[in-house]
Amino acid sequence: GKIKGLKVVGIAGGSEKCRYVVEELGFDACVDHKSDTFADDLAKVCDKGIDIYFENVGGKVFDAVMPLLNARARIPVCGLIAGYNATDLPEGPDRFALLPRMLLTKRIRMQGFIVFDDFGDRHAEFFSAMVP
């Protein structure tokens, strides 16, 4: 993202991990998903909305991201770690009904992918493009 001039915001658990994301990885900002004010903090940092969201978590993180997605946003889905060990539906309100409506009205593209299906043989190319 930063290579293309985009604002890049990370989400991590704890202040030390957020410090690492900003200072070592070079992200513009990082929001602590363990904070009681996580959704508000994310909204403040993403004050112009979100155009690209790499979904790898799901759960309350995706719940906080959903209202911030801009029209024509793109969401590559690589994982949903918040639900990997789930054996039942998650507690709380069912937000799934909102997702198709949001995808339609905001014309958002959401696509799942397994990295090794298409890109496993291009790891070296990706690494050289992403690591300065």
Question: Which residues make up each language-model segment?
Answer:
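Adenosine-nucleotide cofactor-binding segment
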Residues: I3-A64
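Glycine-rich phosphate-binding loop and adjacent beta-alpha segment
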Residues: K4, K60-P132
